């Protein structure tokens, strides 16, 4: 990673609710996060929440182990569900209640769109690549060091 000043990795797979992002600056990991849907599935949570994650309203999982981060995401999801139920009981449709709770507070689980939005804030949104003019060039693929696995 020391050959590049800013290295990033992003991943998502909607079928299994998998999302991941990693950023290293000047060869030092700044943020590593990965989640796969269901059960205890925060796979890794290293580093402090970045300003961009906060702007996207991701839950602040700074300092939490994967298990603690997973518990926090599910706690937030339960809070949001309870608020949605309260809004439905007050007369809103379920759809309106979901929309309203998504506008406030942290997101319980980041999704595919969140990953590309974060990519755009850190560097380039991959969804915008077809509209951009980039010269043919060499791409780089690298293996993450084993000591980054939590």
Question: What spans do the regions from the language model cover?
Answer:
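Single conserved position on a long alpha-helix in the C-terminal lobe of the eukaryotic protein kinase
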Residues: 1-32, 36
């Amino acid at each position: 990673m020391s050959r590049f000043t800013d290295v990033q990795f992003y991943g998502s797979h909607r079928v299994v609710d998998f999302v991941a992002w990693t950023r290293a600056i000047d060869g030092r990991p700044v943020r590593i996060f990965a989640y796969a849907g269901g059960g205890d599935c925060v796979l890794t949570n290293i580093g402090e929440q970045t300003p961009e994650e906060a702007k996207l309203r991701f839950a602040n999982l700074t300092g939490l182990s994967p298990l603690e981060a997973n518990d926090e995401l599910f706690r937030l999801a339960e809070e949001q569900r309870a608020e949605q139920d309260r809004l439905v009981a007050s007369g809103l449709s379920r759809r309106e209640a979901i929309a309203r709770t998504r506008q406030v507070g942290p997101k319980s689980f980041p999704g595919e769109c969140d990953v590309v939005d974060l990519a755009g804030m850190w560097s380039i949104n991959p969804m915008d690549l077809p509209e951009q003019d980039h010269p043919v060039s060499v791409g780089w693929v690298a293996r993450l060091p084993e000591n980054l696995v939590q």
